[in-house]
Amino acid sequence: MERKEFIKACGFACLSGTFMMSVFEGCASSKTIAGTIANSNLVIPANAFQDKNSFHKYVVVRQDELKFPVCVYRFSATEYTALFMRCTHQGAELQVFGDKLECPAHGSVFNNHGQVQNGPADINLRSFPVTVQNDQLLISLK
């Protein structure tokens, strides 16, 4: 095998590996839970990220009073980000794929802090402050 062919084959293998990792990450099921509203806070249990045998990086919280769900990412026991899952481009509900949220309507992509990674959206997602209190997460909706 010549050097040029070797480099080409290695590049293809790297791209394939990267693609497959993103595919498998996207196949992981999202955990969806119901939240409750109390005193202008969306409340979920702090242990919502844990299942019997697995740990989730994020949970999707639905609540009937909210038009869109909220995606809550856990970075540590005290650091969370809560993002309104409404695309800032034209208002479609976003889908979560690992560390990114994607708009099925026009392809906008946001990272797990709500920042635009790929347009057409040019405004970051609405985020909510999260505090930990008595084994609960309080997501301020104010």
Where are these regions (language model features)?
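Generic short alpha-helical hydrophobic face used as a protein-protein interaction/packing hotspot
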Residues: 10-11, 91, 107, 118
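Structured, soluble extracytoplasmic/luminal domains of envelope-associated proteins
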Residues: 90-111
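N-terminal pre-ligand scaffold of iron-sulfur
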Residues: 27-88, 93-97, 124-142
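Short cysteine/histidine-rich metal-coordination sites, predominantly Zn2+-binding motifs
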Residues: 101-107, 117-125
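Generic structural "secondary-structure junction" signal
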Residues: 96, 112, 118-119, 127
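N-terminal secretory signal peptides and thylakoid transit peptides that target proteins
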Residues: 1-25, 29-33
